[in-house]
Amino acid sequence: DLNHDGKIDDNDKTAIGYPSYPLLNAGLTLGFEYKGFDFSMLWVGATKTSRVLEETFRKPLGETYDRSLMSHQFTDRWTPETAATAKLPRATIDGVKNNYRDSELWVKDASYLRLKNIEIGYNFRLPFMPKIGMEKMRVFMTGYNLLTFDKLKISDPESMSSGVPQYPVMRVINFGLNVSF
């Protein structure tokens, strides 16, 4: 009851959370070379940003045809038996009920820290290389999106559309060999 009139209604609305675009972005690049080895990594992150979970998360019995029923939407919902442990309001098919309105329950912290890129390599200097006209030979391993630390958990926090279910961010690991003649 934000306006202290003794009832909870539309007059008790207030702004919650942060914008969907981050108010603070950061990045850090580290790297070194030592005795033929090279290493680099890029960390990116953002904070002071929120996501409002959309209808798919709020209304598992919902009003749209693309329902991807997530088991937690039922196991974590309020029932008389789970009244003390429920994390979500009771499931209804009526979308205008108060438990589906915007509230702190549906606004999630989308701050994150991600290891966006990491690469380790080794440059060979072998006696046979000049004899065959080889200038350089390097082996390497590169990884993309290998680690993400976030509170959102249900979606990619870096995506502006993370209020809806989506395919997870792809992790990629590449191995390679560069040879120069």
Annotate each PLM feature.
Residues 27-29, 117-121, 174-176:
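Membrane-embedded beta-strand positions in outer-membrane beta-barrel channels/transporters
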Residues 67-70, 77-84, 100, 146-181:
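C-terminal beta-signal and terminal closure region of outer-membrane beta-barrel proteins
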Residues 1-20, 61, 70, 78-80:
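Conserved small-residue
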Residues 36-40, 127-128:
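Repeated loop/turn-to-beta-strand initiation elements of outer-membrane beta-barrel proteins
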Residues 34-36, 45-49, 117, 124, ...:
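Transmembrane beta-strands of outer-membrane beta-barrel pores
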Residues 46-138:
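Extracytoplasmic gating/loop element in the C-terminal half of outer-membrane beta-barrel translocons
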Residues 41, 139-141, 177:
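Membrane-embedded beta-strand positions of outer-membrane beta-barrel proteins
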Residues 24-26, 35-37, 111, 133-137, ...:
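Outer-envelope beta-barrel architecture signal
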